Amino acid sequence: MMKIAVAITGASGSIYAKIVLQQLQAMKAQVEEVAIVWSDNAKTVWQHELGNSDFESLSFKSFDKNDFMAPFASGSSSYGALVICPCSMGTLGRIAGGISNDLITRAADVMLKERRKLVCVVRETPYNLIHLRNMAAVTEAGGIVCPATPSFYSRPQSLEDAARTVTDRALQLCGLDVKGYKWGES
């Protein structure tokens, strides 16, 4: 059983966050606890992109982005993974630079220093050189950069199916057993 934190930033791609949360809700056999932290703009972007505020009915505990008393803000907690989905390039840059100025970046720093899973689902295109260097720095520090790039060999039939190819991969990278399409497996 894993405790997992989900950070949602204001980057475009709220559909990814919504699907991650739906998937985690369905993984009760693998996931003991889920905590959510929202950046300043995350809920605004969610409402703009998805046209709703479904996030208000989530059964997970939400933490304020300035709540450094949240359990996953400390290495002594038993949280095993943090997935930042979507991860803005600003957030990635602060993580790469070791700047822990809010709960999202502090939790990322904890995951790196404790050698736990940090998965950053970046959603930006095109990348500039600063983005690439920040992705390299986070990777070198032990994080995993998982671009929000859907795969199409599973022949997704909807936008949600395409987005799920990204979220399946992100949750697999966190160490969860996801029952999604896998190349060469029936």
Task: Give the ranges of each region predicted by the language model.
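A cross-family phosphate/adenosyl-ligand binding-site feature
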Residues: 2-119, 123-186
